[in-house]
């Protein structure tokens, strides 16, 4: 866990640290690698010690170990310290109204995350939790709009795009604009394992939304040169209360 320790001083300077946890974490599951991953809980604990507090759990490997794997990873995250926030796993449709929130320095942030697919493994009624797919735009719109009402800022993680490609596809651009229009302030893309471009989008209400289409890898065993180059997105979110009581967020 040397790499986590190396970045800890950087993370210590931030108020909030978010990461896409692309493998199931548990102390119960046997560790396994490609194509169906599971990771010892010590990995997540090392990230926690490094300063990570927000973990996105929605990606193409979420269903790798089926219902039993989901149950084990849910138990693991429930055992983590209370200041850990997870997003991207929902306990059925009745849970969709729950918006993960965190208030830091008087600023409330909502965290949502979605995935394009789960490697052909469908959601099953036997699963204790499920992801929300990017194709479920009606659900996503409801969540993002609700989050926009409840929080000062809405950060959305999206697991999308083409693996090992620096090219942003039309589906990414379309969904990014929709998310911005619905209320997202920051969109963090993952899945391609290589860097893709970033840009500002103008939302329907005039807000500016920042989207990083892919940050590449943080920690992996992939070894292509462009897979070894990842980015850490560092943003400043500012909330200003005017004398008349109105709040400006930027």
Language model features: what each stretch is:
Residues 2-250:
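Acidic, metal/ion-coordinating pockets
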């Amino acid at each position: 866990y040397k790499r986590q320790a190396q970045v800890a001083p950087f993370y210590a300077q931030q108020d909030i640290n978010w990461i896409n946890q692309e493998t199931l974490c548990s102390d119960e599951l046997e560790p396994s690698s490609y194509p169906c991953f599971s990771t010892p809980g010590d990995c997540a604990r090392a990230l926690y010690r490094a300063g990570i507090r927000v973990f996105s759990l929605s990606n193409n490997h979420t269903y790798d170990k089926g219902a039993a794997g989901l149950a084990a990873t849910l138990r693991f995250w429930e055992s983590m310290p209370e200041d850990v926030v997870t997003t991207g796993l929902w306990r059925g449709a009745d849970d969709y109204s729950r918006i993960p929130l965190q208030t830091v320095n008087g600023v409330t942030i909502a965290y949502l995350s979605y995935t394009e697919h789960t490697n052909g493994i469908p959601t099953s009624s036997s699963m204790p939790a499920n992801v929300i797919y990017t194709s479920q735009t009606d659900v996503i719109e409801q969540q993002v709009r609700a989050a926009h009402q409840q929080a000062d800022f809405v950060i959305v993680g999206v697991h999308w795009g083409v693996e090992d490609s620096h090219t942003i596809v039309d589906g990414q651009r379309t969904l990014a604009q929709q998310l911005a229009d619905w209320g997202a302030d920051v969109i963090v893309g993952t899945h391609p394992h290589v860097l893709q471009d970033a840009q500002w989008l103008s939302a329907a209400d005039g807000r500016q939304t920042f989207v990083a289409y892919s940050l590449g890898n943080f920690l992996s065993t992939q070894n292509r040169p462009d897979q070894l180059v990842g980015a850490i997105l560092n943003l400043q979110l500012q909330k200003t209360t005017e004398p008349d009581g109105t709040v400006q967020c930027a």
